[in-house]
Amino acid sequence: MLLVSGGDDRQDQVLVRPRRGDIIGRIEIPRIHVSVIVLEGSDSRTLRVAAGHVQGTALPGTIGNVGIAAHRDTFFRPVGEIRPNDMITLTTLHGIFRYRVDSMEIVDPNDVQVLNWTKDAELTLVTCYPFYYVGSAPKRFIVHARQQD
């Protein structure tokens, strides 16, 4: 949750972190027909029923890197079709936030720096790769996007 209070020419942001399992919002990627609820947490139980906001990353609408993960064989199956300049919308109780895809990359599972804090409002999508691999996938497919609002 984000609480904002204005004063003079500045805004102070006070974050109240959601608890694991809380509804964060909905992520939509219209060109590839993705529309899925996002819950707080990226543990296996959460990812069975929704996409998950990676705990410790920024919340939508704040400065920093918002991390969202989902399984490649369910909700994020179409993410392999994503392209630069595709639009991603995150709808939350605190607003609608639009992001434009900058780039995609494939990384090792331990390359968690893709979720590091950033000085700009960004979004990082994470799913396993290859998309049609049988078993535990050896890589991660990463989508980087920048907030447009």
Where are these regions (language model features)?
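Solvent-exposed, non-transmembrane regions of membrane-associated and secreted proteins
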Residues: 1-149
